[in-house]
């Protein structure tokens, strides 16, 4: 059999080195026909919107790369609405919005694509503006059965309502999304307190953060050291006063510094210059994202647990980081989307990396990831399915912990929208 050399140029190293069966760039009718006739039921279509996940390309499978043909951006300024193609990366969206003094709650990375939005979308701005999916106004694309859809939030019939909810949080299992209409927001200045801290200081800062107003949020990384960002949006004089009061509490942490930014787009979180962890372009990696509520009286035991996890990490490239939820996110009806864990306060994620082609290290690193997840379950029992791991043994458990009591509905939706399972399996 002839060796297949088709490669896809994406940020994720696992995917960029996958020997894909075929690369396609546009959704056409014959795409669905050929997939329906596929002789192997283990085959499915991989979708690349930004290329930051390990599931956007797999050996021997077809990848649909949306970045070339679906990269349009159109702002309807009078409606505070922006329409983006399914292949637009967040960096391009934010650069475009910055030129119009607008913003959107993107995450800590600007490399992600529309998949970030469709799987939930947790941002430092989410405590004030909700998740990315909470700000979707319209969706266009193709269900797995080949049917074209054009849905508008305020014009849904009873049949479309469940599909709309499913696409907000579980789209990768149901459809190929080619356009999303998003609500945009006026851009405001940002103040950040950032710096390296120790274990005891992390405990104190998490305790402070669980009382934050909605314009503040905490993000941290625990790698070779601990680095934090306390993020504050300054919309008006009241924000300024509240932020000043809270930032005063951080003066006792002498390693922390205040930085000012004109807008959210100017911030670069966890830059490589800080050397927080070893960034190796020859590494393969996996990420698992957890969800849980306030830590409250468990903060110190959690930080102790984190210290043990980091002590046991198999190399300098692995780490654990976290974002803060809450605020506006909790106000939405859990049934408004398939991101059901609305009461969550924290989203930690475990980043596990190993040298490519080193099967022994891969096994060791994945064992560390699963053992760390097991230790953290007591604090963060749920999952945010930001990456699909149907190539790993944990996939079914991740799906269950992500969709919970709505998993039955999702399976029904899957049977309706993607009966031949041409998209990733549940």
Please describe what each predicted stretch is.
Residues 1-426:
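Soluble FAD-dependent oxygen oxidases
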